[in-house]
C-alpha cells in the first residue's frame, strides 16, 4: 500500500445479509455492508482512519482513495457469524507459512493497533459514550473487557490455554492478554500450532489469528471514537 497507484488486493466474505470486504495484506482494514459495491466503498471510506493507526510508526500505510484501486482476488461463502456482523472465514492467503519475518510484521501491526486502541480508551476516560437508539452500548471499560474476552477465545482457537480473568485489574489483564498473543505468534513461527485441537476441531492458522485479533480491536477502537460525546 506504499503507492496509491498500486492495486490493493482484497477478499470478500459473502453472507446472505452482509458482505465483508477485507484488505489481504492489511489486517484490521475490513468493513461490511449489505452488498459488494457498498462494502468496497465503505472500505475506502475508512482507509484514512486505518492509516492514522500507523501514523506514529514506521509502517508505510498510504491507502487508495478509489475502489477502482481494489483487486478482488477471492470471494468466500460467509456463514451465520458473517450475517451476525463478524468476519468468520479465512482467505486462502492465511494458509501460507508463518515464519519469523511474518511474526515480526504481525507483531508490529498488532502493537500499532493496540497503541491506537489505548489512545482511544484514554481519550474516553471520564467521557460519556453515546448510546444506541434503544439505549444500548457498553461503557468504556466494558468495551475493553469485551475485547479481552474475544482475544481469550481467539487464543484458544490457536491451541493456547488461556482464560480471561474478569476479577483482575483491567490494566493488568490487558498486558497479560497481549503477552499471551505475542507468545502465540512465537509458537506459530516455530510451527507449534497444530492443524487440529486435542478434540479434533480445526484450529486457526497464525495469519488468520492475527487478522481476527486486528479486526476486532480496530472495530471497537472506532466504536469508542465514534461514541464519545
State where each predicted segment sits.
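Amphipathic alpha-helical packing segments from all-alpha helical-bundle domains
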Residues: 112-120, 174-183
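Short acidic-aromatic active-site loops that bind/stabilize oxyanions
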Residues: 103-110
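Catalytic cores of extracellular degradative/oxidative enzymes
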Residues: 175-200, 204
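Generic secondary-structure boundary/loop-capping signal
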Residues: 67-70, 126, 190
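Short, charged, surface-exposed hinge/linker loops at domain edges
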Residues: 2-6, 48-102
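Short, contiguous alpha-helical
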Residues: 9-10, 15-36, 40-59, 107, ...
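Short, flexible segments with low predicted structural confidence
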Residues: 10-12, 81, 88-89, 114-115, ...
Amino acid at each position: 500500500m506504499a503507492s496509491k497507484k498500486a492495486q490493493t488486493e482484497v477478499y470478500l466474505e459473502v453472507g446472505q445479509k452482509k458482505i465483508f470486504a477485507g484488505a489481504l495484506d492489511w489486517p484490521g482494514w475490513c468493513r461490511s455492508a449489505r452488498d459488494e459495491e457498498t462494502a468496497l466503498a465503505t472500505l475506502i471510506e475508512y482507509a484514512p482512519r486505518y492509516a492514522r493507526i500507523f501514523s506514529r510508526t514506521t509502517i508505510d500505510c498510504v491507502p487508495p482513495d478509489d475502489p477502482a484501486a481494489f483487486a478482488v482476488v477471492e470471494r468466500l461463502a460467509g456463514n451465520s457469524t458473517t450475517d451476525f456482523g463478524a468476519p468468520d472465514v479465512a482467505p486462502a492467503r492465511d494458509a501460507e507459512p508463518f515464519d519469523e519475518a511474518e511474526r515480526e510484521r504481525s507483531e508490529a501491526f498488532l502493537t500499532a493497533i493496540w497503541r491506537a486502541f489505548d489512545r482511544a480508551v484514554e481519550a474516553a476516560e471520564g467521557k460519556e459514550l453515546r448510546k444506541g437508539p434503544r439505549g444500548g452500548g457498553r461503557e468504556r471499560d466494558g468495551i475493553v473487557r469485551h475485547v479481552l474476552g474475544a482475544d481469550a477465545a481467539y487464543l484458544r482457537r490457536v491451541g493456547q490455554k488461556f482464560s480471561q480473568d474478569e476479577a483482575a485489574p483491567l490494566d493488568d489483564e490487558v498486558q497479560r492478554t497481549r503477552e499471551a498473543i505475542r507468545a502465540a505468534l512465537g509458537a506459530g513461527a516455530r510451527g507449534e500450532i497444530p492443524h487440529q485441537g486435542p478434540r479434533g476441531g480445526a484450529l486457526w492458522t497464525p495469519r488468520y489469528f492475527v487478522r481476527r485479533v486486528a479486526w476486532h480491536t480496530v472495530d471497537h477502537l472506532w466504536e469508542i471514537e465514534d461514541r464519545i460525546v
